[in-house]
A protein has these predicted regions:
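An alpha-helical, amphipathic repeat domain used for nucleic-acid recognition
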Residues: 1-197
């Protein structure tokens, strides 16, 4: 039966290296060491070692995800993609479900905050919808987020901002606003009201 021969500290203060039969086996959190009651001389079956390694992998992925969420709010899909890039694809779903249970991941809250931020930047509803869709947000949640956007006000503000120092070229302004995701039918009345040539 395999025997724990050494537990050494890592650079990360809450983690240790586990050595089994004088060979490095995996890194563990101090919580795992305590819950498994590991010490030098502990005997473990191969099945227990496999479970321990699997738990360690989930724990490491969870800690990475928590740090990632500390940078800014993210959607579930963004966290899954991040863990995939960090080579934790096999445990990404388990980690995301845990983060949701613990309240760290809420796609509805993310979508509301993200769309509000984009509205302040005068994004069109279509551009916000496309971005939230790419971030894995459901259509129902997206529809709730963009329902109250005042497209006309955003277009008028963009026209005013763009024409502050110069006369408005109607065609250029039209291309600019269409490029920002606004529809022709929303842009035309605003341009007519602005008196552009």
């Amino acid at each position: 039966m395999p025997v724990v021969t050494k537990l050494t500290s890592q650079k990360q203060k809450d983690f240790v290296n586990l050595y089994v039969d004088d060979e490095f086996y995996c890194g563990l959190s101090l919580n795992q060491v305590a819950s498994w009651r590991l010490h030098k001389g502990s005997e473990l079956t191969h099945d227990q070692l496999d479970r321990l390694r699997s738990e360690a992998r989930v724990s490491k992925a969870y800690n990475l995800a928590i740090r990632y969420l500390g940078l800014r709010i993210h959607s579930s899909q963004e966290v899954i993609e991040y863990l995939r890039r960090k080579e934790f694809e096999d445990v990404s779903i388990v980690v995301v479900e845990r983060l949701k249970r613990e309240g760290y991941l809420q796609d509805e809250n993310f979508a509301l905050r993200w769309s509000a931020m984009r509205q302040q930047m005068l994004w069109s509803p279509r551009a916000i919808q496309d971005e939230l869709s790419r971030k894995g947000i459901s259509k129902d949640v997206i529809d709730d987020c963009i329902r109250g956007i005042d497209t006309r006000e955003a277009i008028i503000e963009l026209i005013a901002k763009k024409s502050r120092n110069q006369a408005i070229d109607r065609e250029k302004m039209m291309r600019y606003l269409v490029g920002r995701g606004f529809s022709y039918s929303d842009i035309k009345p605003c341009l007519d009201d602005s008196g552009s040539k």
